[in-house]
């Protein structure tokens, strides 16, 4: 009987880990043939930290180059409880890219169609989103973020990898810098 009481006391003292860790698959990078996902950890009843990223290691043809990696740590404050409802966040991002021969939506970086850019970026911003609970483990989350990115790049005359260097430059970008529609699994 004494062993049972000691075991019961020990079990009551253990911290429960239900719904503290989540893994996510961001479906938006998949549209472009990239892998996107991340892991989140609850650090309180209304706070989580996340490490997300995206990777596209290949190109499609000589006239179309689109290789990059992105890493994006984020802090999220949930208005109700973690992994449920609305949240606000602050994030950092870093990336390396080699892209050209591509037309982006809304006329953003319109010169990408004729030229190739190779370089890196660092920045950060603020985000907001919503998390829908489907059941105890599966959820869907959407998020949008705006921020600042410092971009350092080399611009090449055309899309081909053998193209001559046109110039080097820097760009200060302010605008949308995060978008996600994620399938989330809670442990």
Segment roles from a protein language model:
Residues 22-30:
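Short strand-turn segments of transmembrane beta-barrel domains in outer membranes
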Residues 41-142, 180-185:
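Gram-negative (and chloroplast) outer-membrane scaffold detector with strong preference
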Residues 33-36, 125:
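Short, surface-exposed coil-to-beta transition loops
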Residues 3-14:
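Sec-dependent N-terminal signal peptides
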Residues 135-187:
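Predominantly the C-terminal beta-signal and adjacent terminal strand-loop region
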Residues 24, 36-38, 76:
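Short secondary-structure capping/turn segments at boundaries of alpha-helices and beta-strands
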Residues 18-19:
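Boundary of Sec targeting at the N-terminus
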């Amino acid at each position: 009987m004494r062993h049972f009481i000691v075991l019961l006391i020990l079990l009551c003292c253990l911290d429960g880990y239900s719904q503290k860790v989540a893994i996510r698959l961001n479906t938006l990078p998949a549209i472009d043939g990239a892998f996107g996902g991340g892991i989140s950890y609850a650090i309180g009843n209304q706070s989580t930290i996340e490490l997300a990223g995206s990777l596209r290691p290949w190109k499609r043809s000589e006239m179309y180059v689109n290789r990059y990696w992105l890493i994006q740590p984020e802090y999220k404050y949930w208005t109700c409880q973690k992994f449920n409802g609305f949240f606000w966040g602050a994030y950092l991002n870093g990336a390396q890219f080699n892209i050209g021969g591509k037309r982006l939506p809304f006329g953003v970086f319109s010169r990408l169609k004729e030229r190739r850019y190779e370089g890196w970026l660092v920045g950060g911003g603020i985000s907001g989103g919503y998390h829908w609970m489907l059941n105890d483990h599966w959820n869907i989350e959407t998020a949008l973020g705006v921020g600042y990115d410092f971009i350092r790049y080399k611009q090449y005359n055309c899309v081909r990898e053998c193209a001559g260097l046109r110039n080097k430059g820097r760009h200060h970008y302010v605008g949308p810098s995060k978008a996600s529609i994620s399938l989330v699994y809670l442990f």
